[in-house]
Amino acid sequence: MDKLKKYTPDGMRDILFKECEEKLYVEKKLRNLYKLNGFSEIISPTLEFYDVFNFENQPIAQEKMYKLFDRNGRILVLKPDMTMPIGRIVATKVNYKDYPLKLCYTSNIFRINENLNGKTSEITQSGIEIIGIENIKADAEVVITAIESLLQLGLKNFKIELGQSKFFKEIIKNENINKEEVFTLKNLIENKNYVALKDYLKEKTKIIKADTIKILEQLPRMFGDIGVVYEAKNLVNDNEQLKALDEILSLYKIIDKVGLSKYVSIDLGMIQDIDYYTGVIFKGYVEGVGDYILSGGRYDKLIGNFGCDLPSTGFGINIDNIIEALRIYEVLNIRKFRNVILHCENKYLNRAYKIANRVRKNNIICEISLRDTIEDTIKYARSKCVDKIIFIDNREFIKIYDINFNKSKEVIIDNFLEELI
């Protein structure tokens, strides 16, 4: 086993220095936005019982979960998602009466990625959940918060695609097709495989009504601006189908009034995980990033799996994909701090620490050199791209060396901060 001690497992990676700073920056920006919107943060354990994720229509295949056993032989998993643990917590730990309950989170999740394809199996997910209320205002707040999250991070070249899980369900509700056939239909429509879908539906003319086939054939093409919804309404007569489409229209109108509709498009063929969702669904894409960066929607039946029926809606952001997008568009505006190093002999360390604390109170990074010689300190400072070195002894003056200009200046100790700020 010693041969593996220098490596990370498949799908795992180390995050170092600049990338770590970028990640913490993004997480902090999102946390602050959630807090200012009235969301309270929640943290769930990394290990959960497998049962938390083992229920009908949950969207994560058990083959994608990292499993292990506790000392009693019970199956545990590294949590593959945050929404279901939040459902467990709300149903069992939160004594809340005045809904809605607005929660947010930032956490690592784990999903086995067998093909890898540059993807990792450990993902940082950040998001919000609005629990205990079922209305269009809650749906709008979730989508608007998703848009504002991306804008807050500096992204502009993105689209939030809105779909409706109810629409497809209502289309096939009265058709005599089994789960396997529904699964095939969903994949063909989601992947916009027009030819294969048409051929498949030709084989099903005896069990699927002609009007239904006509709508299903059009579903992969029903994407674009809000006009797509009006086109869909002209194709259907069923009241429940029309009601599902009206929900998207109502949501879009709110987003439009807020002035954010330019970031929204429609995709009625977005139906891959609709068994999990019960209403409006959405995904966020950034031009140049291959995978979606966020996803969400309404899932009114999920918390019922934990014995507490509460309507819910929310979204999760893939932090790793967000950082990729921010790099592409060069909008990672991380504040840069001035950086100095302080050098002294051991006998002046007491004085050095007092001066260092004065420097740090002015939001300047101040590192006390651990090198013994001036030459080694200068060499170390250059490797760290430090601007200035402060030399301290027992005098009332201190020497400040500017590395970039190769110049030194002695200043009275009471006034030295002016030379750094």
Curated annotation (Swiss-Prot):
One Gene Ontology cellular component annotation held by this UniProt entry: cytoplasm
General remark: This function is generally fulfilled by the C-terminal part of HisG, which is missing in some bacteria such as this one.
Family according to the record: Belongs to the class-II aminoacyl-tRNA synthetase family. HisZ subfamily.
Keywords assigned: Amino-acid biosynthesis, Cytoplasm, Histidine biosynthesis
Keyword Metal-binding included in the entry's annotation: no
GO biological process, one term: L-histidine biosynthetic process
Cytoplasm keyword on record: yes
Record localization: Cytoplasm
Entry function: Required for the first step of histidine biosynthesis. May allow the feedback regulation of ATP phosphoribosyltransferase activity by histidine.
Native species: Clostridium novyi (strain NT)
Chief location of this protein within or outside the cell: cytoplasm
Highest taxon listed in the record's lineage: Bacteria
Assembly and interaction partners: Heteromultimer composed of HisG and HisZ subunits.
Database matches in InterPro entries: aa-tRNA-synth_II, aa-tRNA-synth_II/BPL/LPL, HisRS-like_core, HisRS/HisZ, HisZ
Pathway where this protein functions: Amino-acid biosynthesis; L-histidine biosynthesis; L-histidine from 5-phospho-alpha-D-ribose 1-diphosphate: step 1/9
Gene encoding the protein: hisZ
Gene3D superfamilies xrefs: Bira Bifunctional Protein, Domain 2
Any one GO MF annotation of this record: catalytic activity, acting on a protein
One matching Pfam family: tRNA-synt_His
Name under which the protein is recorded: ATP phosphoribosyltransferase regulatory subunit
